[in-house]
């Protein structure tokens, strides 16, 4: 079959497999690529190819991840699969692989296991909005009542973490049997289940809103004055669009936020009608003095984001080998928190009953910053000590 030209006409969605070790995440990933390849919608990737995931660095942390791509009649997908449990934790906390939806793989023979629970919790905390379930290894279970029991357990678990467990689509099948058969026909007992799963992913996980359609936000990286014209803030537009005449708010580092109007937008020293997500720009701000805007603040559409000092976070603490701490930290630990473009000192409060946090741990903690930062749930940050990264985190809830 001639290799098809990749066309960017279909909407794009990021997904990934999550679930307990050895429940079949990688086998399922291989099966999806094989079955879809029969319809010319993917390149088949073998288990071994996916399993030997290359190392990547995200925010100074080494993560092993495999990316595969495939499409259905409706959409184009990028799919991540991680070999080890620690890789999932790091991936989800750093946002190295932002998922619009996840395929939770649970062995019908074993039912939910500790990492099943931890991955659902992580998905909830880091903002993976949708989960669909593949009950794998159905060929190893003779009693249909057992499968129903596992299905009920999974729905319960999803409900516990505020996912709509009762309405979550669950597909029962066997990734291994589909791989072994490989006929790719919809009417096949095993291959058909992979098609059913892809239909569910197509229908149940919505196409995400594009960054460009979200409200404007730009982290300020630098500020300078243009004589006779005023103050310019530079940075990369994180989301939305901005044009001359737009009202923007300067937020962060103080409790007061100020509104101003954009009087000029420049990119590569040329004026621009409108800048959008991904552009590196300079924004000329009306009536703003050089000292009234600084690195670490953000420019945003008024009313869309607020400054906060107290929040709850999911944090991964780097190991010594990753360049992190060699020793644990305790309640009251005061490192720097690096948000977007700047470091802010903060104090850590550990959960009740947690004495200390060891390098390599994944923990929920509370933080109080000494100055407010423009913040919302899902915002990523690094924890630093003397300029080196010792942890990675994501804001899971705002306290005040």
From Swiss-Prot:
Region (G5): 174-176
GO cellular component, one term: cytosol
UniProt-annotated stretches for the region G2: 60-64
Sample GO molecular function, one term: GTP binding
EC number: 3.6.5.3
HAMAP family recorded: EF_Tu_B
Complex and partners: Monomer.
NCBIfam families: EF-Tu, PRK00049.1, PRK12735.1, PRK12736.1, small_GTP
Function: GTP hydrolase that promotes the GTP-dependent binding of aminoacyl-tRNA to the A-site of ribosomes during protein biosynthesis.
Protein name in UniProt: Elongation factor Tu-A
Record organism: Caldanaerobacter subterraneus subsp. tengcongensis (strain DSM 15242 / JCM 11007 / NBRC 100824 / MB4) (Thermoanaerobacter tengcongensis)
